[in-house]
């Protein structure tokens, strides 16, 4: 009986493996057979090798072409001609829930229902459109002026070296928190000697532990140690990113009634009838959205600012041409109307920064 059972299991395994490799709807895409067989292939490169999947995908493209299958149901493309077809304005297919997990309260970035995502995105576009951002320029200018004043104080005190990535992340966090709730995190003032404030340390801790937290073997081992009282100490709340993002929502809701009419992101997300088929967010939903916006905005804007300024600073010719164009511009001109700012400079920066990114996965 045991022999028959073993034969049956082996036969079922062979059939299942053959189906995934040769007969599934994804079998038409080229790629390693091991990747087609099991999602552990992706886990190995993304989690165990801590983020090496993107680099490995470029090696796969060199071997298999512009479209590569790197999981049982995952493909990756590096042909720009496919971008508009996949990331079109009105998608005909939804996001894969398995990729985003199963959050109790979805945010815009993690919402897998197409109609709900469209309604939430339409609401947010009213606060992040270019026209609205231009109207909020006084807020941006105020934060810029605050940053210049702190840099002046630090340089006058003899400080010559700064963590420029943290500087840009602090600026982004203060600006984004103000834009979202009307109050600022105060990251630029949190560290008197630089820009290593509590929130910046918290998001850095999240980045540093991201792959460890996704490692199911490490998580189960840690849980087992906790059962016997040998687990790691509780996480310092000041290193928990959620302490700050959820606190921003708590502070906004507690003072909402006394603020009157606002034009913040949280305000429009809690207004009834903002757009058709949109329901005002509850407190847990607003917290989920706040976490998502901060996670998507602070590191991204910080990296973009710091890397862009680096590429400008390393080339004196670019600095000179940019400064000349700004000095000779008139008050009536906008940055978008300056040819070098939006033309040659953008191409110069993007051509260098292409080495920092890989093509988006599907």
From Swiss-Prot:
* Record's subcellular location: Membrane
Cited InterPro entries: Cyt_P450 (IPR001128), Cyt_P450_sf (IPR036396), Cytochrome_P450_monoxygenase (IPR050121)
One Gene Ontology BP term is: secondary metabolite biosynthetic process
A GO CC annotation recorded here is:
membrane
Got any disulfides in this one, which pairs?
A: none
Molecular function in Gene Ontology: heme binding; iron ion binding; monooxygenase activity; oxidoreductase activity, acting on paired donors, with incorporation or reduction of molecular oxygen
Q: Which UniProt keywords apply?
A: Membrane, Transmembrane, Transmembrane helix
Which sequence ranges are marked TM in the entry?
A: 3-23
* Pfam families linked to this entry: p450
| Family to which this protein belongs | Belongs to the cytochrome P450 family.
Primary localisation category = membrane
**UniProt cross-references to PANTHER family, sorted A to Z:** CYTOCHROME P450, P450, PUTATIVE (EUROFUNG)-RELATED
- Which pathway does the database say it acts in? Secondary metabolite biosynthesis
- Name-wise, this protein is Cytochrome P450 monooxygenase-like protein avaN
Membrane topology listed for this record:
Single-pass membrane protein
Is Transmembrane set as a keyword in this record?
A: yes
Q: What does this protein do?
A: Cytochrome P450 monooxygenase-like protein; part of the cluster that mediates the biosynthesis of a highly modified cyclo-arginine-tryptophan dipeptide (cRW). The first step of the pathway is perfornmed by the arginine-containing cyclodipeptide synthase (RCPDS) avaA that acts as the scaffold-generating enzyme and is responsible for formation of the cyclo-Arg-Trp (cRW) diketopiperazine. AvaB then acts as a multifunctional flavoenzyme that is responsible for generating the cyclo-Arg-formylkynurenine DKP, which can be deformylated by avaC.
